[in-house]
Amino acid sequence: KAKLAEAGGFKGDKITLSYNADAAHKEWTEATCNSIKQTLGVECVATGVVDFATFRTEIGERKMKGLFRTGWQMDYPSIENFLSPIFATGSSSNDGDYSNAKFDTLLDEAAAETDAAASNAKYQEAEALLAADMPSIPMWYGKTTMGWSEKVPGVKITAFGTIDFSSVSMK
């Protein structure tokens, strides 16, 4: 509450946290709103949007008011695939309209690098800027739970959280 007051307080009568109602988001968004109410003393309402397509349209057309949930599944295993599409100025998935010239420059420099270690170092610098600016609030990350037996050795999980069936064998 002290930090909120220091930042100028909350302007408005309530916070709205929107989610697509055609998936399992109601429970955690309501829990998040309850936490906001209890911690900050600010009214918060979790509001479902009928389906994902409508939800994404409202976000894309900048009709969404207040907070909204989002998520990202990497297309390929690289830090770049989390930074550029979501946070680069003008990127199609930059739903929060984040813009930082230094961040964009670091992304460009990282992409131009021919050395993977140097490229990753630039991406990590850009990531540090995101941590300082905090344009979105990471709530959690997904995880995959798998099980197997001694009769099925060598099971490997891909970077996408699925079984690499080429690694599976039977004893």
Where are these regions (language model features)?
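Periplasmic binding protein-like
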Residues: 35-87, 122
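Soluble non-cytosolic domains of exported or imported proteins
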Residues: 22-30, 49-53, 97-101, 113-120
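Append "and occasionally in soluble cytosolic enzymes with long acidic Gly/Pro-rich linkers
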Residues: 1-34, 38, 125, 169
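Solvent-exposed loop/turn segments at secondary-structure junctions
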Residues: 21-25, 52-53, 73-77, 128-129, ...
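Ligand-binding clefts/hinges and TM-proximal coupling segments of bilobed small-molecule sensing domains
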Residues: 112, 118-141
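Short, solvent-exposed loop/beta-turn-alpha elements that line the ligand-binding surface or hinge
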Residues: 57-63, 84-112, 141-171
